[in-house]
């Protein structure tokens, strides 16, 4: 064996030897020297000095010996030589004697060593790591344990390294046209298991450590690499297993001249310099590492038919369409470089902060199809790999679709105000709905707000950190207000369409001819839903004014997509009669009806798009959800309406949620905004109330008009509108009674449940929390309770709308009573509705003690229904009637429950105000009575509903 081959067997006591070499040497030593080797730095230095003294002789004697014999001779030689370096015990000084005794006594005790490197998860969580692969912490919490983080060195690079890097960059640029440009020097570097200093990856002539290959190869990987390279030197070919494992890097890939990747406005970066991908084959000892699930196959020359440039990190939404691929898709499945953490420091061509997962390009996801519980998450997995584990992502998707009731669908998350999508379409194991990564990230973000997963609760700061990263990822993938086409979907005249009448519109979505692709049309609807998720959570926080930016973007994009209009009906051959029967979950033709050839009417020319019946219903439900929130927020923030009734007068009303989730698409439905209660979901009982509220908002805006308001308030037209709105409220009240009668009849409901249980046609949407209710009787009782709860909520909001119809929205104007409204008949009628609303609130607390049924919507109606009670308590004090006192007590209890469920500042503030007023009603007048009244006015003055007031938006 040549001298060069001996370089792969470092000396046992070399400070640069691997841990495997140290362990092999230690086993051949005596116990005393074993202790010295492990615990004495002094002995290690002495042995190193002896090795340097006899280094030349050892190299000569070892030539020609087998590897095992060389190891034995080497160990024995150093054992004898090292013993000669120690003095007789009688000649040692007392300090050395004491140290030797301590070392001998501690030989049996375990030696604690400080690990050189923690795994990426433990480093991110600041958790103690044992340095194993996988480590104990990741095994306990089911995390992906990897060591992909780059090793950093303090200080700047030396001039010698910079010069070598510049020379290497020049050499790489010269040899960029050679597909197989690896030389013998590069092979020698591969044999050594590392890259030589003159071959370090460079960018623009400077060394960039972000692409350096990690040096922490384990022992088995080093041994296999060494043996493979020795065989290559002897027989001039690699063993089969060495070829499949890619050797030591990507230098040997036949890329047919495409190893230089060029992007617009970006310097070229050769593919061989992407040596950070080399870390993938070094972690095959970890079954959870990405390389353990890579499909090894032979790389063919050339690139795929898709875009073959690295995605712009500032446009992460484009990564879901075009991926960086190696090999041909027709012959080989694309390799999945998954779970790869982004580099800790951005390279020179990546002007972004790190380590945001949205900045890292995503890759193909085929290898996760056998292990991922919900394949719908494939598009977002590369972006969340460094944020949450896959198992938690699947659990969060379950949380998003979890229902709090087993009888009727009711979202458990307070931030899911209504179901827009079908649960079965998302969670289908083989053919899920095609979603944009931004929508999936927003769903995970919404679910993470309330999930009880240990990953989000320990430590206490984990939820905030994860939610912040998911929020940044969602916004990065959504690209707010920039909804241009993804690479590969751009039409030839897209650049020309981006300039209209001399105005460069850029990527702000004005030219919509890119909707010619089905994925773009679906992606546009997904973007609206993503805006809804962002706006909902922000509206429920203390930053209510900031939420209007997201709501405005959602309303504008929905109007641009014409979601308020019905698409042309199905063609006769779109859905044969033979496909109408069967199980909706098993019959994929029923779950995904045949596409409809329709015209979207966007852009300069109409584009043909395939629209399924399920996608049509998603468009309807998304519009009606935005329609309801527009009216709700108009009351909350004292603003005019954005979406008009005229825009959706021909749009079909939403389906019943139970039928929608079961996939039974109804054929006959009414069109236009509803005014009657039809179901248990938000679309059934709350949407009609919002239709009526929109008319009240328009009436109030006309009353408060700065120039025409006074004349309108005294006109007959105003009185006619008030009477018409009151009539619609009476119609809703009657429909609410009929709804309660229809769903609370025990015999009818019990028979229906029994029949459904026998024929197995009951919709399968039972939540995990409600699966214990297995008998028909328990489902009947739960359905009755759920119906009564819906009726109580509907009754309360209906009474509040009667109060709002009177026009007294502002609490300060009520307390001032400048127009003596408190002595009018209108006040008496409104006061009766205030007491009725308090009684309905008492029923709500009976059926829903924590007010978790609709916490996002309920707060403002509870507040507006309480202003008249506050006025009565403030004016009458101890002379208030018992019904008013009970109503005040109920309102205080309801506000306390709201604070627990969805904690907001205005609810905490008004709870204190009502408690102070209730104490006065009961006769407990404080000494500083006038001061407390003034303090109440100051608090209420923060929330104004006057002409220039902003309501709850502080």
From Swiss-Prot:
GO MF, any single term: zinc ion binding
Compositional bias of kind Low complexity: 8-21
Listed Basic and acidic residues bias regions: 64-78, 574-590
GO biological-process terms attached to the record: DNA-templated transcription; positive regulation of DNA-templated transcription; xylan catabolic process
DNA-binding region: 119-145
One Pfam family named in its UniProt record: Zn_clus
Role: Transcriptional activator of the xylanolytic system. Involved in the regulation of extracellular cellulolytic and xylanolytic genes and in the regulation of the intracellular activities of D-xylose catabolic genes in the pentose catabolic pathway (PCP) in response to the presence of D-xylose.
Protein name, UniProt field: Xylanolytic transcriptional activator xlnR
Recorded name of the encoding gene: xlnR
